[in-house]
């Protein structure tokens, strides 16, 4: 091989022992087979077979980075559905919010309720700027919105999908759809035997490199390295083949959802957007902020979705039956709110409550709040009195609603839970329980709020796995 010829030339060159050692480790890092007579002959097979289980964002990034670092490796992405990157296709309303500028994030815990310490560590190697640059260098111009969310300039998720699929095709990464992993067995030769359930529909992606396989049935294949990038599972059973190997599983539960509100009159305000607001759960330290959207079932918008993420386990433990507090005026200092209300009373004593909206609240919401307090819209501001002012301030800053269950957030279904990070080598993301098995993406106990943070975690963890899976 050309690398053997290079090594022969190296032997004739005048280089120090230290330089030779560095060159050895460099080529070992690239998984290049060394000369057969080298005293530290690389013990990897010349054709390293790698399986990536899950054709999502993390899986593709792991495969592409692995192929870049270990070009000799035979890499196949296995996807259980009939097409890859389905979740990428719908995220951001079909526009693909692929990352975030993180300019408004001072502490990663704000974005990653679970896994923030690991993400901080991994961001030193591949962060949002690296992801931004990677896509632009691979032909996808990006734009950053005012809310710091990053989208393809085309505003079409297929720009991202086409980039990933075409890059995989160009590098020779194979893609097999309709392959569902059902079991993993450790073999004596340190390979991993994978059992797949193959559906009747032929499972290769059109235009991508693919090996032949049975049209349906059970298929067994052994690999030297395996990366699990299957995303989150709504039920514990989805992790059975991993728990059977000895991995600890943090209970999977939903972590990004809307709230069903019991108050029928409140839901009549559907379509009303209030921004920004504070949301919180009384009696806890759980809180969030951002725009709030009133829907026909209750509450949505970033202020609710963020709260649902941070409070995922608390909400699950309470069967999604809790009180939510809304601070409609986005002001935590009650004294300042009192000053504002007193200023309105002094300046407009004879005007009706309905005619002056504190903090420029939406008209429909303000009328609803007046009636919720038990006042007539025609009541004059001068007639509020101290008791009335206190009630108004409390309503503006701590308005309570009963949550009766959770709704769905169709643009981004996320779960918390998954493979316990205590089972993972935090540098390589290789399993401590099963050698040669790696993890990336939401299958790990890492999840984020809405805004491109979950996809960034997929790019980052996929990149790290791709750096090490061929070593």
Role assignments for model-derived ranges:
Residues 48-77, 469-470:
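N-terminal Rossmann-like FAD-binding beta1-loop-alpha1 element of flavoenzymes
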Residues 231-233, 237-240, 245, 445-471:
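A conserved FAD-binding loop/helix module that cradles the flavin
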Residues 166-357, 362:
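Predominantly flavin-linked oxidoreductase catalytic cores and closely associated redox partners
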